[in-house]
Each structure stands twice: as structure tokens, then as C-alpha cells.
Amino acid sequence: MEEEVAALVIDNGSGMCKAGFAGDDAPRAVFPSIVGRPRHHGIMIGMGQKDSYVGDEAQSKRGVLSLRYPIEHGVVTNWDDMEKIWHHTFYNELRVAPEEHPVLLTEAPINPKSNREKMTQIVFETFNAPAFYVSIQAVLSLYASGRTTGIVLDSGDGVTHTVPIYEGFALTHAISRIDIAGRDLTDYLMKILAERGYSFTTTAEREIVRDIKEKLCYVAFDFEQELQTAAQSSTLEKSYELPDGQVITIGNERFRAPEALFNPAVLGHESGGIHETTFNSIIKCDVDVRKDLYGNIVMSGGTTMYPGIADRMQKELTALAPSSMKIKIIAPPERKYSVWIGGSILASLSTFQQMWVSKQEYDESGPSIVHRKCF
């Protein structure tokens, strides 16, 4: 029994769910973390209308559904919908029986204790998994980069965290969270495109703007300088073809949208930018570990995929840090999925196999076992 069964690794993000088998180098399934329910109940009898749709199917039928994201800012807020997403992951995406595989799930840093317990309970009681483990997302990203010490800037669709990690343990007191991430940048891009006269309002149109953002946006090395360049010439302008064939032109919006990561004030947020947050997290750590953190700043998550973000981060942190400090930003090309990849590495290690919470341990101790075995 020991060897041949692969563990399942599921990284539940606010925007996308990444799932697959431990030992693989990429997730098998990547789909939107959404559950859709019909807005109008079936008029046509016998149309076989389901009472809920998950992921891509919900996305494609979004015109007639009301869509909900069960994960807000990285934390699960709707457990019934979350259960539907896991069910969909096991049975429709991976096509496995969860009672036959150990399951590794990921959680946001500073996830409430009750949430970990609820997660544990659902995996064992609803899905009857033989074994379970929950791991902090940022720690997995660090593993994926081949490190055990460093600070991870993890920015996805719903939340951004800076998480200092020493020898594999997250230094909880120094973790910072900013509620600015991909979704906010998409909204901001919608707003500034409207100023140019392009109106995007519906949830369907929001997906178009997300695509524009992913294909054309970048981070300016020097924001003021870039604004001047954009004003004086058309070198920075790019065109984008909408689904209906209309072509729109986008100029300084390309770098104005992601600039919000470094200057959240444009979104009306009080928090500091990602560079200040990273710096503040490092400052909260012991003097002796700071050098190791400055030298291992690892980016992870889809919102760190903008061209130019690493160079800009290097520049901003150099200005904040002590002058003698060596600063190194690591931005691996696969960072969009590095949380999942780290989980795949961890769950397939031979030394990890004794770390799983087994069904037997769960039956003896209840959900609180998760705090004793998963750190």
C-alpha cells in the first residue's frame, strides 16, 4: 500500500484553484474558484438544469448565473461552496476517489485556527481521506525555490502577504497582509480605462479587462519618468482586440494599474506599498536573521508576474535598507504555480510521510489534531 498511491495536492487560491498529484512538476487542473447558481429557476422543464456549477463551467455560463467566490482575501468564508469546489476537484478534475489518497491542502498565512479545524473535518468526514496535511502557502513557495530561509512576497488574486521564514518556520509575528491583489488591479484598470472612454462594467467584461492586464501591463522602473515618456510619444501604446472585433488602444494605463502595488493610495488604501510592507516585515525580525531575509526575497503568485516588478522591487528596497546590505530578489519563471509546486515536492518526500495526520489520529483526537501536527 505504502508506495504506489500518490498524494493529492490542492492549492486553493482566492481566484484560481490549482490541483494535481504529488511528484508532478505542474498542477493537472487549474480552474476558477467560483460557484455559480442560476439566477432564474428553470422555466424549461427537463433541461437538466443543475442547482450549482463550479469553475470553468460556471465561468462559461456566467450570463445566467450569480457567481460567488468562497475564498475571500485568501481565507475561506463559505464552507458549503468550498465543499463543492473540493468535490469538483476530486471527482471532475482529477477523477480520483479521495478515500484512496492522502490530501495536502494549502492555507493563507495567519489563517484562523477554527478554519484549519473545519478544513480537517471536511477532508476526513465528508471525503473520508486516509491522511491529511495543511501547509502555509508562502512556505511552500519558498521550498519550491529550493530554500528554507527567506521572505516570500506572495500576491495572488485576493490578497498579498509578506512572510518571513526561518529554517522552514513562518515567523508569524512579522507577517504582513495587504488586501490589494490581482482583483483590485483589474478593477482599477477598468476604472482608468473608463477615463479613456472604454466602458467595462459587467462581470463578463471584467474578464476581458483581466486578460488585457495579464497580456499588456508592466511595472515601470521609474513611474514619473515613464509617465513623461508616455505623454511625449506613442512608443508605449499597444492595441488590443476585443471579442467583438473592436480594437482599443492602451497607453500609460499599462503601467498605471500595477503601480497601485507600490502606491496603494491611488486605490484609496492606507497601507504602504509592497516594498514598504516587505521592509517592515524584515524589520520586525531578529537582527541576526535580517541579512538572510534581504538576500532571499522570493516572489510568488500571479500578481508578481508583471515584467519589471523584480527590478523595481530591488530599487525600492535598496533605498529603504541599510546601505551595506546585499539585496537579492528571486522571481522564478514558474512563480504563478510555485505554491502548488512546493506542495508537490513536500508531499512526495520520503521524510514527510510520517508527518501526515492519519484518519486514525483524527478519529482519536478530533479536528484539533491539526494544530499539533501541522505547523
UniProtKB/Swiss-Prot annotation:
One of its GO terms (molecular function) is hydrolase activity. Keywords: ATP-binding, Cytoplasm, Cytoskeleton, Hydrolase, Nucleotide-binding. It is an enzyme of class 3 (hydrolase). It comes from the Eukaryota. One of its GO terms (cellular component) is cytoskeleton. It holds the Pfam family Actin. The keyword Cytoplasm applies. It comes from Thermomyces lanuginosus. Its EC number is 3.6.4.-. PROSITE patterns: ACTINS_1, ACTINS_2, ACTINS_ACT_LIKE. Actins are highly conserved proteins that are involved in various types of cell motility and are ubiquitously expressed in all eukaryotic cells. Disulfide bonds: none annotated. Belongs to the actin family. This is Actin. SMART domains: ACTIN. InterPro entries: Actin (IPR004000), Actin/actin-like_CS (IPR020902), Actin_CS (IPR004001), ATPase_NBD (IPR043129). It is found in: Cytoplasm, Cytoskeleton. It catalyses: ATP + H2O = ADP + phosphate + H(+).
